[in-house]
């Protein structure tokens, strides 16, 4: 009798582990495809606008107008409380909600900034883009808050990997940036 209980327990554990493995395999594949595709498009557009600006140096004269355009976009999207990458990290630590409208806003505003010669890095944009899309995928799949946080990290890794072409470094970077300031 005890052997049968032990056998049931063993098979239940195997089933649960296989279910978790399959669930995260599908979710990470979806996040990788969607976020990776969007981030690859972002990287191509970024290269295009940077090359265009390099060959048309007069574009920098319109940088103040580009800044006004970006402020106008933030106003249209009704996005007043932009904390940048910190918002993505706060979502992972369960402090704030991550809006999906952050993704197109970051995509467009970073391209405008680069087109007119502004100073903006790709790292923050990658993390915000990937985190925002990953969080939205988690909502669409109706995941728990804890699972959505993991999907946000998957999205951050996928975006970072697609933009910089470094998949292993992207995973390590996402785990590292989430653990900053946490002592074990």
Task: Give the role of each language-model region.
Residues 1-184:
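Alpha-helical transmembrane segments and immediately membrane-proximal extracytoplasmic
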């Amino acid at each position: 009798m005890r052997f049968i209980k032990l056998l049931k327990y063993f098979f239940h554990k195997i089933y649960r582990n296989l279910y978790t493995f399959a669930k995260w395999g599908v979710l990470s594949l979806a996040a990788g495809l969607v976020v990776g595709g969007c981030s690859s498009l972002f990287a191509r557009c970024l290269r295009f606008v940077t090359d265009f600006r390099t060959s048309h140096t007069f574009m920098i004269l319109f940088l103040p107008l580009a800044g006004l355009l970006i402020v106008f976009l933030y106003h249209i999207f009704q996005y007043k409380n932009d904390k940048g990458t910190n918002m993505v990290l706060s979502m992972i630590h369960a402090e704030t909600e991550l809006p999906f409208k952050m993704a197109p806003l970051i995509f467009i505003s970073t391209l405008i900034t680069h087109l007119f010669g502004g100073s903006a890095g790709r790292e923050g944009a990658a993390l915000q883009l990937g985190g925002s899309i990953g969080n939205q995928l988690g909502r669409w799949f109706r995941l728990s808050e804890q699972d959505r946080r993991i999907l946000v990290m998957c999205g951050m890794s996928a975006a970072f990997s697609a933009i910089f072409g470094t998949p292993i470094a992207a995973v390590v970077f996402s785990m590292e940036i989430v653990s900053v300031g946490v002592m074990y």
